[in-house]
Structures are given as C-alpha cells and as structure tokens.
C-alpha cells in the first residue's frame, strides 16, 4: 500500500483581457491539495485520488462597463484507476474514472446556482514500452454524467520518459 499527497498550484499566467468573456489566460490563482492511495494485488493495481480545487477572486472579470469581482466555490475531485500490469513485458492497461462536483460562481456577490459543476468521465489507458525508460501511452475517455459543460470525448497519445527504475 502506498499513500501520498501533492499540491498543484496554477499561477495567473497568459494573456488576460478583462473586456473579453473568453481569454487565453487566467486572472486568478488556483490550488489543489490532493491525497492518493495505491494498492497492488499481484498483477492488479488500484489507485484512488481525492482533492479539492480552491480559487482566488478574479477582481476584473469581464469588466464592461465596470469591474466585477468573480469568486468560485471549491471543486471536489475524485479519480480512480484499476490497472492490469503485464510484468513480463512492462505493458499495462487500465480502466479510468473520475468525478467533479462544486464550483458555484458568484459575480458581484450574487451566487449563480446554475454554474455548479457536476460531471464524471470513464475511459481506458493502454501503455506499451518502447525501451527500458520510455513508453507510449494511449487513452480514451467519454463523459458519463454531465450537468454543466465537459460533454466531449478525448483521445490522446503520449510519449513518456522515466528517469526512475521499475519498482519491485
């Protein structure tokens, strides 16, 4: 069994124009403390993560004609993976799922209950080794329950390099 913790921080970077509703950048900080659990049973591995996104106030959200401070309530996130490891050749596959809830926004102190995010996705991942420290990873996911946004399918391919050795 492995227990872990992490803290993800997103700084207000990129180009932000308060006169536009949609921007390339963000005008607030975001923090996500997260706790994780991993347990192996032979060739099977179960991973689970729970975290909460916290956001600072955007004091210049779409400020036409005057600046409007926007706040967002925390967003809880849960993620899980059930993986099958093929040790002989370091190949693995997994069933992946996640769930988010929260994020009600307020503009000028007025809460918008319609902005609450509640969504989940399910998918799979396949990883094949290329060399001792490199692998190719392919994944697919689909929205399973979408209340607000996020109703899309994803397909991804990634090259992964690991500087660490394989756990025993």
Predicted regions and their residues:
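Outer-membrane pore/translocation modules
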Residues: 1-71, 114
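Outer membrane beta-barrel transmembrane domains
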Residues: 65-168
């Amino acid at each position: 069994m492995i227990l872990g913790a992490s803290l993800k921080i997103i700084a207000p970077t990129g180009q932000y124009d308060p006169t536009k509703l949609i921007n390339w950048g963000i005008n607030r900080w975001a923090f996500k403390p997260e706790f994780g659990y991993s347990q192996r049973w032979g060739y099977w591995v179960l991973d689970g993560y729970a975290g909460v996104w916290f956001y600072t106030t955007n004091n210049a959200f779409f400020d036409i004609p005057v600046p409007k401070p926007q706040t967002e309530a925390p967003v809880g996130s849960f993620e899980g993976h059930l993986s099958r490891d093929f040790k002989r050749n370091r190949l693995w596959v997994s069933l992946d799922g996640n769930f988010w809830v929260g994020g009600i926004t307020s503009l000028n102190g007025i809460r918008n209950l319609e902005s609450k995010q509640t969504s989940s996705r399910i998918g799979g991942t396949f990883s094949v080794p290329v060399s001792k420290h490199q692998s190719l990873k392919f994944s697919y996911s689909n929205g399973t329950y979408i209340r607000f946004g996020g109703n899309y399918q994803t397909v991804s391919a990634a090259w992964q390099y690991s500087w660490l050795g394989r756990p025993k």
